[in-house]
Amino acid sequence: MSTPVVTVIIPGRDVAAYAPDALESLRNQTSTQWRAILVDDGSIDDTSRIFQEAAADRRFELIRHDVPQGLGASRNAALDRVETPLVTFLDADDEYTPHALERLVTTISESGSDLAVGAYVRLRPGVDGYVEGPVQPWVAASTSPARRGTTLREHPAVSGNIVAWSKISRIEFWRRHDLRFPEGRMYEDQVVAQRMYTLARAIDVIPDVVVRWRERADGSSITQHKDAVDVLVDYVTAMRDGVAVLDAASQRTAAAERVRLILQMDTPPLVRIASTHDDPAYRRIVGDFVRELAARADGDAVAVDTDTKGLLDAASLW
């Protein structure tokens, strides 16, 4: 068995329908230099059994939470147990592509950078199962073409990759900067991603697709519940806090790029939901956020397309 150089942290709660595919995608990696920490976050379905059976393999370690604590706390608990030089994350409803770890480990090992970022695609439900979509433009902008030893200032578009997974980083980097995920809220990875970019001495990006991000057929994932007010509050807070991290680091170009992407990609679906939502609080939160970002965009000369601008102009009157 190869000596592990990377720990894969896999948190999950009630993901029995998807966890077997996630774990199989890890076992099928072309690289064998990994170990994994599974975090069962208070599951009440078969996730506990699936994780327990996986842990019979020495490469897997299992952490159990009797009471759900959320993704942030689950990832933090696993981070405390990492003993390998490198660490990465995979959500238990997503999948790795076969060469994911090989490409990420090779890149960061050869470059000496603090972190490396890969591309990802959506897995969407189809007639005969899940169908892999294309690399979206904002994902491609952050990871293509390949770069080694770059920085956020040199490559501000990398700030558009705000997920915990699809990256590999050095555990020493986490511990040197006391990086932790916020606990008790959703979209906890956005602010951590921006902190990583602002703190990294060097960043690698590769255009290779390393993760398939699942859109669950049953609509049960957090990102599929943006019509709920509590989810909206955490979502808006995460986006706002992420931009604030960039501002605090004087990363003006990256902050402007992030504002543009939020206005172009994140806010239009929220505006459409708000236009028919039965809770006036939802519309008020979206309207406040749109006005805040629009003012910021005007000051930074950030442009969005005509259709998006019309939608945002209407929302700014709420």
Residue ranges of predicted features:
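C-terminal subregions of glycosyltransferases and related glycan-biosynthesis enzymes
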Residues: 215-318
